[in-house]
Amino acid sequence: MIRNGNQVTYETRGETLVIHVGGEIDHHSAVAVRTGIDEKIASERPQKVMLELSGVDFMDSSGLGLIMGRYALVKQYGGTLSVLDPSPAVVKIIKLAGMERMVSILRTKTKQ
């Protein structure tokens, strides 16, 4: 699905929902991206959610809100949320916000 220039695709791996997000996550796009993700999480109620953010080339505080809101949503269902293969831009803002203490960052790809 493409919304506001962002590409969001979903992949289910057993009890894990992998959400691939590409493009920019800012105040212009975050609401549309968040709405689609929330609908998918609510319908599937996965035990694990992985936000795969290797294709995100820009993220501002709206992106941090998107991650933390999904973290809280998944936690309500007893699940966990991780950030998978974040781009350097995403890692930078997550670390600046101190969020790596709350949300695990997983890497399956070698650093770029």
Name these PLM-found stretches.
Residues I67-Y71:
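Histidine-anchored nucleotide/phosphate-binding helix
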Residues M1-D57, A72-Q112:
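STAS-like cytosolic regulatory interaction modules
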